[in-house]
Amino acid sequence: RRVFEERALIDGGFEAIVSGHRKGTGSSRETAPQCERWSGIRLVIAASFAPIHERNNINLGQLMGDHSILERLQNGDSIDLSEFTSKYDPITRLILENGGILPFAKKLNNGEIILPESTTLERPMTMVEKIIAQKMIGKNRDGTFVKPGDAILAAVDGGYSHEFTTAQVHTFLKNEYGDDYSIPNPIKFAVFEDHLLYATNVPKFSPHIAKIETLRDMQKIFQRHT
């Protein structure tokens, strides 16, 4: 019997989830925190977090804290938002405090958020640093320079999505921008079937064929937006 039954989280009415050390180890895919987020979880407590899992939580706007935060909440204390965000760089704080990467990006595009100015002075840069500096969003001057450790946003030239992530991406963009959303420069964005290409004829996948077909259908819907 499963220790954690299907739909136990989404039907449980939970708002917080509590774990031990290195929460998310082995769960680097975005799906792990996405399942928690869209099951109603808004506060994630752990003794420590695996780095990729922590980053994915940040991008979803999930507040994270340790067990001392949990004890204070159990004692009825009010905790200021800054206690959850102050340890991060200025841009990460903005992402968290505005509800995640998509709400943040929408507000940034609408001019509701101003990015911190780059303060790195002129310096020799590697080829990668030069590319990043050229692509930096919100450059405050010509000849912008970057250095290791700078927190910046940079525009990308292209991207991709496969059928294990497309359904979620489509849902998130639709929720944020509406049914008629579009992505910038779609000709540079690839959409392809990868993980489930041969799943129909794999016996262990047979109990999940209906869900697999849903993922494939959502892939086609997303393609029409790209």
Each language-model region and where it sits:
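Fe-S-dependent hydro-lyases/dehydratases of central metabolism
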Residues: 1-226
